[in-house]
Amino acid sequence: MRRILTFFLGSIIIGLSIIISPSSSFAYPFWAQQNYENPREATGKLVCANCHLAKMTTQVEVPQSVGADSVFKAAVKIPYKPGTEEIGADGSKVPLQVGAVVMLPDGFKLAPQDRWTEDIKEETKGVYFTQYSEEKDNIILVGPLPGDQNKEIVFPILSPDPAKDKNIHFGKYSINVGGNRGRGQVYPTGEKSNNSIFTSTAAGLISTIEPNKDGGTNITIQTESGEAIIEEIPVGPSLVVKEGQTIDIGIPLTSDPNVGGFGQLDTEIVLQSPARVIGLIAFFAGVALTQILLVLKKKQVEKVQAAEGI
């Protein structure tokens, strides 16, 4: 019942966002949540890349190792040129928005707010975190957020405690991260958004270029067989062809309006055992003590040799 209610409320929110703010609604991770049980495919690709075709760099910073039941930060960096604007769903210029996903190992999850430090509270101000599904609290989503203020998104993470969960073990784990800026080029239905380049589906002569009822443009191509092919271009992309021009199949009809992109990467973190840390400290202390004793022994031998005139 709870799952149905969540889906219903999510549908209402998304529906309203599409009506009220179509330029930003396409960035919501709702699409991935409803279409994919797991956001990471067998190939390792995050499903975000199925709609966000352009590639851009994403970076992440995590500690090399953490202790059990401790809070740490995963900082996802989504760089792009300041002031960059993209084409919204209505064809107008809008600021870029950003989003991120962090796929943690089983047992790791978003830290409860009562364990956030003051620094974390300050760094996450205005950021809303959601888990991918009720069953996957180790997958955390953020976005869309205004890009100019959120080029770095801090995720407060709680590490598991093997003493409380026998399925968790100390050792090295992989973390998968994805970061996006801007709208996608393809909708989950397979249709192109207006944030994409449009190409011709037929060869022939462009006979007419006319505005259509949706604010976009209809390009009519007369083929050699006499057939009239109408290419519907949505509002937003700029045309790069003109009437009377002869074109081939696959020729760009518009410029590429996209200025954003998606990037993903993997990193590693070690869930450190306290016993191992103590063992390492003891080992290094033993090595240091051995070195000191060797130096002292060497000096003692040198003194004896000097006294004996050797």
Curated annotation (Swiss-Prot):
The record's free-text note on cofactor binding: Binds 1 heme group covalently.
Residues given in the record as heme binding sites: Y28, C48, C51, H52
Subcellular localization(s) per the UniProt record: Cellular thylakoid membrane
PROSITE patterns from the UniProt entry: CYTF
InterPro entries recorded: Cyt-f_TM, Cyt_f, Cyt_f_lg_dom, Cyt_f_lg_dom_sf, Rudment_hybrid_motif
Pfam families, alphabetized: Apocytochr_F_C (PF01333), Apocytochr_F_N (PF16639)
Signal sequence, renumbered to the chain: 1-27
Record's keyword terms, sorted: Electron transport, Heme, Iron, Membrane, Metal-binding, Photosynthesis, Signal, Thylakoid, Transmembrane, Transmembrane helix, Transport
Membrane-spanning segments: 277-297
A Gene Ontology term for the protein's cellular component: plasma membrane-derived thylakoid membrane
Main subcellular location: membrane
GO BP terms: photosynthesis
Membrane topology annotation: Single-pass membrane protein
Cofactor: heme
GO MF entries: electron transfer activity; heme binding; iron ion binding
Subunit relationships: The 4 large subunits of the cytochrome b6-f complex are cytochrome b6, subunit IV (17 kDa polypeptide, PetD), cytochrome f and the Rieske protein, while the 4 small subunits are PetG, PetL, PetM and PetN. The complex functions as a dimer.
Role this protein plays: Component of the cytochrome b6-f complex, which mediates electron transfer between photosystem II (PSII) and photosystem I (PSI), cyclic electron flow around PSI, and state transitions.
Family: Belongs to the cytochrome f family.
Protein name as catalogued: Cytochrome f
Biological source species: Prochlorococcus marinus (strain SARG / CCMP1375 / SS120)
